[in-house]
């Protein structure tokens, strides 16, 4: 790479202040470029340019977001002369008659993130130390991370430092590790740009720089792709099959403080669909953590190879050669299925720890941190209770918005209820299929009465007794337990 970011703290602070004054935010980008504008590619730049107004904010987006050269006087008018000088001092731009950004400065919420060029623009030319910005996996990692005041946080494979900065808002101290020196340079610059002084960057592979240390929050969006290559620091882990992800999970367990949480984006392999989650369940077993396995994409050999080499789709011959190399690699390993997803960990004392698996849609996941905390807290309480019927004496309330749906079948003439769904409308947006008759019990969970009393009242209202009342109680307990384990309900 022909340029290198420079963590000049004074210059970065000056630039950050100027960007805040002009209100360069994610919302502003969407307002000016449209809903799809935030994910713009290099090919879309000509259209984006023509959408921008002739204003100070428009000039800033043209230079920093679209990465187009602008007259130095125009950018000085928009941001101030000191900000233009800061762009040069931090290595972010070449300044002459025009200001030309070497990379991009992208607003992520109210943060500013510097990184390399447009992602995937010409991946074949990307150097091994290429540093990406706020990718879809970065967004997912953020959405799945429990937040709150903590002493220490750790971000593994920090890249441009997005997760480290998000943790730095509430952690007294954040350690960011990466094997790529250039990534740490970006992280240091981004920390300065956003005014963070509590992020420490350490060079090294994964957990090696923090040997013997523990943390309250651990995040990892390190290169988890199952790949026969070792080309890019941001994609290829360099170990066989899913060993890179296995190492991350097992080391995270060792480095979590008591009551700490880890959010790890990983991938795992399987020989067939019937055994698709065996690997992550094995990784998480035996440690002092409860785990939540969240598969997102489960792909066969060919689809996996295509997904991670889509940058070659305009070059049929090399594209085919790469696909053959990837599928042959997986075939030699006996791998039929590659799954990408997340593993969430919560460390707690006790002799019994549990895992569960739920498939999620990453397009629907949004700020699930509170849901995740409630879920792990509820699971710990359920372990303490012991017998399933002990839950009857507990008071439980819904923890957020849920939608109760009934399924009707009208094909036989008169509509007949055939199913029901409790849809969680926040966080991971998971749903629980159930029986129509249990929806009224869900609606009555306000924490004022015990679960046993709520179920007994429902049985009386329906005139149920004996085996029918026992069946209602059993089914209701199963449903309430499921809602607790998903973080859709809480103990009152």
Positions of predicted regions on the chain:
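Conserved Class I SAM-dependent methyltransferase catalytic core
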Residues: 180, 241-295
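Long, charge-rich, low-complexity alpha-helical segments
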Residues: 56-103, 142-146, 154, 159, ...
């Amino acid at each position: 790479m022909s340029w290198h970011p420079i963590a000049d703290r004074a210059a970065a602070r000056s630039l950050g202040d100027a960007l805040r004054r002009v209100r360069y935010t994610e919302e502003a980008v969407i307002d000016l470029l449209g809903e799809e504008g935030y994910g713009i590619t290099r090919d879309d730049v000509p259209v984006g340019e023509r959408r921008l107004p002739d204003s100070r904010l428009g000039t800033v987006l043209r230079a920093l977001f679209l990465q187009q050269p602008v007259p130095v006087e125009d950018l000085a008018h928009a941001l101030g002369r000191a900000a233009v000088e800061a762009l040069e001092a931090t290595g972010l731009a070449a300044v002459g008659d025009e200001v030309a950004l070497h990379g991009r400065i992208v607003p992520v919420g109210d943060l500013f993130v510097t990184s390399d060029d447009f992602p995937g623009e010409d991946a074949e030319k990307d150097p091994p130390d290429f540093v990406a910005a706020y990718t879809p996996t970065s967004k997912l990692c953020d959405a799945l991370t429990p937040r709150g005041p903590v002493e220490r946080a750790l971000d593994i494979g920090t890249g441009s430092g997005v997760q480290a900065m998000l943790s730095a808002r509430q952690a007294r101290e954040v350690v960011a590790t990466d094997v790529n020196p250039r990534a740490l340079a970006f992280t240091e610059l981004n920390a300065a740009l956003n005014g963070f002084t509590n992020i420490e960057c350490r060079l090294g592979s994964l957990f090696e720089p923090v040997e013997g240390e523990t943390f309250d929050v651990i995040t990892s969006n390190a290169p988890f792709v199952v790949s026969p290559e070792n080309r890019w620091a941001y994609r290829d882990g360099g170990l066989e099959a899913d060993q890179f992800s296995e190492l991350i999970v097992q080391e995270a367990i060792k480095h979590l403080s008591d009551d700490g949480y880890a959010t790890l984006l990983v991938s795992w392999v399987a020989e067939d669909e019937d055994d698709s989650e065996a690997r992550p369940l094995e990784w998480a077993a035996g440690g002092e953590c409860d785990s939540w396995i969240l598969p997102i994409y489960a792909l066969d050999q060919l689809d996996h190879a295509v997904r991670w080499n889509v940058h070659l789709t305009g070059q049929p011959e090399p594209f085919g050669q790469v696909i053959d190399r990837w599928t042959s690699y997986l075939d030699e390993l006996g791998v039929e299925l590659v799954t990408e997803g997340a593993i969430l960990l919560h460390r707690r004392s006790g002799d019994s720890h549990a895992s569960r698996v739920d498939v999620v849609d990453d397009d629907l996941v949004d700020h699930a941190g509170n849901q995740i905390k409630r879920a792990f807290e509820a699971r710990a309480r359920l372990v303490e209770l012991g017998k399933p019927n002990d839950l009857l004496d507990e008071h439980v309330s819904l923890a957020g918005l849920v939608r109760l749906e009934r399924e009707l079948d009208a094909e036989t003439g008169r509509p007949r209820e055939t199913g029901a769904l409790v849809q969680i409308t926040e966080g991971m947006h998971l749903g629980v299929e159930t029986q129509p008759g249990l929806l009224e019990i869900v609606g009555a969970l306000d924490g004022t009465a015990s679960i046993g009393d709520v179920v007994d009242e429902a049985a009386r209202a329906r005139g149920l007794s004996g085996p029918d009342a026992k069946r209602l109680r059993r089914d209701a307990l199963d449903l309430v337990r499921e809602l607790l384990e998903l973080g859709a309900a809480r103990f009152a």
